[in-house]
Every structure is written in structure tokens, then in C-alpha cells.
């Protein structure tokens, strides 16, 4: 199978990290164009040094480039607000779109959970970095015991959050909360993001709480460990910070949760994660970049394989 050419819209932290991954790691994707809006951005400068065609004129500049004709897949690493127009123009040109913003125009994709179910969609959404780290865990619990409520807290180093991430905090929480339900399988979902200003910057850490039906704890633990191994297959720095914790919530002391109707009794599962980045662009503390761009590249590679299958049948 020949390599599929890709373009990346957004020359910030996420876009630049993704570009480096495609060039260093992918056997089926090839960089075609890096697109930005700031001619002085480090991402565009780095792309040019690495021999990638660039434009600082945004989506309009991309459409005007002769290299765009050979591009088959476009990644959008801009912002939720910019994605709608970007998607419309890219799809109108007959290309596939992978959305790394919280815009969520297309279906949510979490590779180890539903990565094979959306390969024919013209636009797929990668949820958020926090979603990519935590929703696999919610799904792992849910496949053993029905999750009534899933809550995740994603803590990332402030230095790893560029202007696009900062502008999309509300969209981050809304999109992640919805994906906890739609992909993770929880009846209700809640997401919280923390930008940690600590110096030196701390590694990405995520906490997952699931309130679920009472079930075999060992089966839940094993399901979580199996899921962690699946994520590690494309994000080696993804790991459990400590042992999975369980707590029985009895009828004598039921939980009152604003997001849920009535009282809750059952099993509380607590999972603590950390994500160490591969340091392709920002240092290893930026695991939030690594899990997002790794998931996007894995999804693009699966889409490329599906496109190849379609072309040969």
C-alpha cells in the first residue's frame, strides 16, 4: 500500500507534534502540507526545515496550493470555532477530515473502544486529550458492570496548553462529558480539566471515577489492565499510577450526586493514570499532546487502510 499524503491545519503544539510523529513513525502516512496562520510560528518554521510544504494563510492558503491535490486526509488541530468552516471546505474538496478540536461535528473516536466503527465517516472527532486518556477506562469498567456515572479529572501542565486549548476549555468539558456517555457507555458523564502551573511542569495525570453496578472486582480490575495495555500499544507512556481502588456504597450511606437523579448505591471504582509524552516536540511532561496525536495518527492509519481496501475491490 502506498503512503497517503496528509495535511495538518494548525501549526501549534498539537499540530507540530503530530507532524513529527507522522514523519518519524508512520509507515502509511506522508506529510504533504503544514498549515498555519502565523508566519512566525515555530511549527511552520520546523516544517519548512523538515522539507514540508507550508502556508501561513490558513485553510484558504491550503486550498490554493498545488500540493493539496495529492492530499487525501486532513487533520484539523486549530480550534472548535474554526473547525466548522475548515471541515466544510475540506469535505467539499473530496478529502477526509480528522478533527482534533472539541467541535465534534463527526462521530467520536477512541481507538481501543470504537476505532473500527467509524472508518467510513468523512469527518471523525478525536474528542480531547483528557477523553483519549480516560474514556477507555470508563469503557473497560462498563463492559463488566454498567456505569451509571463517570467523572474524569484531567490535569495537564500549563506550559503544554497553547492558545487553542485555552480558548476551548468550555468545549473541552462539554465534548468530553458527552463522549463519556456516547463512547464510554456511562449513563451520565462529567469532565473537569486543570491547567497546572507548577514549575517544573508536571506530567499529565488523570483520575477516573465510575459509579457502577456491583460486580466481580477482579473482573473489573482485569478489564482495566487489558484496556491499559491496548492504549500502551500506541502510547507507551500511558500507565496506571497506582492499583485500582474499589469502594462499596451501601444503602445506609448512599451518595447524592447533582448530576444523577436520586440516591446512588453500588460500587465506586477509582482509577489513577499518568501519561508521559514521547517528547517528539514538547518535553515528556506533555503527555496530553502525545495521547491526542497518537490516537489521531492511529485513526488516520486505519482510515488509510480502509481507503486502500476500497480502491482495490
Curated annotation (Swiss-Prot):
SMART domains, sorted: Semialdhyde_dh
Family statement? Belongs to the acetaldehyde dehydrogenase family.
Residues recorded as binding NAD(+), renumbered to this chain, are 11-14, 160-168, 288
GO aspect biological process, one term: catabolic process
Q: Which GO terms describe its molecular function?
A: acetaldehyde dehydrogenase (acetylating) activity; NAD binding
User: HAMAP family from the xrefs?
Assistant: Ac_ald_DH_ac
Q: What class of enzyme is it?
A: oxidoreductase
Keyword annotations: Aromatic hydrocarbons catabolism, NAD, Oxidoreductase, Plasmid
Name the SUPFAM superfamilies on file: Glyceraldehyde-3-phosphate dehydrogenase-like, C-terminal domain, NAD(P)-binding Rossmann-fold domains
Q: Which residues form the active site?
A: 129
Catalytic activity, reaction form: acetaldehyde + NAD(+) + CoA = acetyl-CoA + NADH + H(+)
State the name under which the record lists this protein. Answer: Acetaldehyde dehydrogenase 3
Q: Name one Pfam family in it.
A: AcetDehyd-dimer
Please name the Gene3D superfamilies in this protein's record: Dihydrodipicolinate Reductase, domain 2, NAD(P)-binding Rossmann-like Domain
What Enzyme Commission number(s) apply to this enzyme?
1.2.1.10
